[in-house]
A protein has these predicted regions:
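Protease zymogen maturation seam
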Residues: 1-25, 39, 138, 195, ...
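Short glycine/serine- and small hydrophobic-enriched flexible loop segments
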Residues: 72-76, 113, 190, 255-263, ...
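C-terminal subdomain of the subtilisin-like protease fold in secreted/lumenal serine endopeptidases
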Residues: 124-128, 263-303
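Solvent-exposed loop/turn segments at secondary-structure junctions
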Residues: 33-35, 50-51, 77, 97-101, ...
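Subtilisin-like serine protease catalytic core
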Residues: 15-28, 32-46, 55-106, 122-125, ...
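Anion (oxyanion) recognition and catalysis
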Residues: 21, 150-154, 220
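Extracellular S/T/G-rich loop segment that most often corresponds to the catalytic His/Ser-adjacent loop
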Residues: 31, 177-263
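Substrate-binding/access-modulating region of protease and related hydrolase catalytic domains
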Residues: 97-181, 211-214, 233-245, 249-251
Length: 303
């Protein structure tokens, strides 16, 4: 995570003084589930499984646990090396995708309804959705999904969604990242290039505009070769961390930054958060919406 944090201007005074690291901020993660990895221990407020209806918390894919570690991992098993962006935020895990990372719109909608029911009780302020539909989904189903994420937004939640990995052609932002209301995140690599390491096979980050000519993604963050929590760490010969790439990995970088912001300014509305993000991004020569996330500028009172 070192290069990720360097790339997004993470090491500002508020972070170095450990003042605003997501304290008292709840973040819901709609994904493949989550395990109580030591880096997340004690901060998972709840879990529900809308795929297999199991009661015990689990993640049979590893995707959701990796996302959660980027967002809020403490770095306990790495002496802080792989700590997430908001290591004191709390998490609410909704399993809406199966062990292959696939799912039905109904699973996501059920997860959304659950988050809305838990919002006030758990002080959920942010919803991280590292989920995107594959091209060719029925239009009616796309509309249901868009209505679902916009219902979250209208309830006052900050909704952060991945742009999808179907780039680099125009018009490749996945639903529900195409929603005008939500904050949509694309991915850059270590050199700041959109969607990968300068080779065609890594040039994956979804591009706008949407069918309605909306500029997307809204901003970008590092998403290529990201080291975070490994859901299989308990098995023999498995390491506590693993590497993944995608806009799914860039999205929790932004969600974590927003958790830090809300721990400093807890009265901010979701619209105010979005405007602060827009004002604080570092513009780029590439097609990257507002530009690159910059945590120091985001937390600054003067921007």
């Amino acid at each position: 995570m070192k290069w990720v944090k360097n790339a997004v201007g993470y090491w500002c005074e508020d972070i170095l003084d450990r003042k605003y690291l997501g304290q008292k901020i709840g973040v819901s993660v709609l994904d493949t589930g989550m395990i109580p990895h030591p880096d997340l221990a004690g901060r998972i407020m709840g879990f529900d499984d809308f795929v297999n209806r199991r009661k015990r918390i689990y993640d049979d894919s590893g995707h959701g646990t990796h996302v959660a570690g980027i967002l809020a991992g403490s770095g306990k098993l790495s002496n802080g090396v792989y700590a997430g962006i908001a290591p004191e935020a709390s998490l609410l895990a909704a399993k809406v995708l199966d062990d292959s990372g696939n799912g039905m719109v109904e699973y996501v909608m059920a997860g959304i309804r659950w988050v809305l029911a838990e919002q006030k009780k758990k002080n959920i302020r942010i919803v991280n959705i590292s989920v995107g539909t594959q091209p060719g989904l029925d239009k009616a189903e796309e509309e249901r999904l868009l209505e679902g994420v916009e219902e979250l937004w209208d309830a006052g939640l900050v909704v952060v969604v991945s742009a999808g990995n179907y780039g680099p052609e125009p018009g490749t932002v996945a639903v529900p990242g195409s929603s005008r209301k939500v904050i949509t995140v694309g991915a850059v690599d270590i050199a700041g290039r959109t969607g990968g390491a300068g080779r065609e096979k890594w040039d994956y980050s979804g591009r706008g505009p949407t069918e309605d000519c909306i500029m997307k993604p809204d901003l970008v963050a590092p998403g290529t070769f990201i080291t975070s929590c490994n859901a299989d760490y308990r098995y023999r010969f498995r390491k506590p961390y693993t590497v993944k790439s995608g806009t799914s990995m860039a999205t929790p970088v932004v969600s974590g930054a927003i958790a830090c912001l809300l721990s400093k300014y807890p009265d901010m509305s979701n619209v105010e958060v979005k405007l602060k993000l827009r004002a604080s991004c570092i513009p780029s020569e590439q097609t990257q919406g507002w530009g690159m996330l910059h945590v120091g500028r985001l937390l600054s009172a003067g921007i």
